[in-house]
Amino acid sequence: MISSNDFRPGVSIELDGAVWRVVEFLHVKPGKGSAFVRTKLKNVQTGNVIERTFRAGETVPQATLEKRTMQHTYKDGEDYVFMDMESYEEARLTPAQVGDRAKYLKEGMEVNIVKWGEQVLEVELPNSVVLEVVQTDPGVKGDTATGGSKPAIVETGAQVMVPLFISVGERIRIDTRSDTYLGRE
């Protein structure tokens, strides 16, 4: 159990049979009446965001999430196969479970798999990945009217905006949270 006074961004709670992550919270102490905590909660499974108000000191069950480091070994048909780095057990995840993070998954990459009981909630990628550019238009000297960037497709199939000087075959670092170019490797 966790008190509503201990809510912080990132704390996971169980509410209405689902896992919710606290995105924002505000402790409000009005001049008249009792204090309360206004929160913005995100459903980890569906991504829905709700606003919920709790009385100050109200206790709710804290979700016990298990985070395991696993390595993406290969793709079998539609499924993604991961290997636990400690027990060497394999886990198969569907494209729906992996979500849009699949565009940066590369064989041999280590990721964190977050589980609630036996249910996989999310796949956490590293904050940045290094991938090779496989397709991009050549940068023409003096062509900066478009802001100095162009689209590039990396080895996993993801499209990222890169500076004009990047060419095919170069390895670049990409921020997986914002889908932005960080630099050359």
Curated annotation (Swiss-Prot):
Keyword Cytoplasm included in the entry's annotation: yes
Subcellular location: Cytoplasm
GO BP terms: peptide biosynthetic process
PANTHER family linked: ELONGATION FACTOR P (PTHR30053), ELONGATION FACTOR P (EF-P) FAMILY PROTEIN (PTHR30053:SF12)
SUPFAM superfamilies reported in the protein's UniProt record: Nucleic acid-binding proteins, Translation proteins SH3-like domain
SMART domains xrefs: EFP, Elong-fact-P_C
Listed InterPro entries: Elong-fact-P_C, NA-bd_OB-fold, Rib_uL2_dom2, Transl_elong_fac_P/YeiP, Transl_elong_KOW-like, Transl_elong_P/YeiP_cen, Transl_elong_P/YeiP_CS, Transl_elongation_fac_P
Protein's job: Involved in peptide bond synthesis. Stimulates efficient translation and peptide-bond synthesis on native or reconstituted 70S ribosomes in vitro. Probably functions indirectly by altering the affinity of the ribosome for aminoacyl-tRNA, thus increasing their reactivity as acceptors for peptidyl transferase.
Keyword hit for ATP-binding: no
GO molecular function (one): translation elongation factor activity
Pfam families: EFP, EFP_N, Elong-fact-P_C
NCBIfam families for the chain: efp (TIGR00038), PRK00529.1 (NF001810)
GO cellular component: cytoplasm
Keyword field: Cytoplasm, Elongation factor, Protein biosynthesis
Pathway note: Protein biosynthesis; polypeptide chain elongation
Family: Belongs to the elongation factor P family.
Protein's name in the database: Elongation factor P
Source organism: Thermosynechococcus vestitus (strain NIES-2133 / IAM M-273 / BP-1)
Alphabetized Gene3D superfamilies for the sequence: 2.30.30.30, Nucleic acid-binding proteins
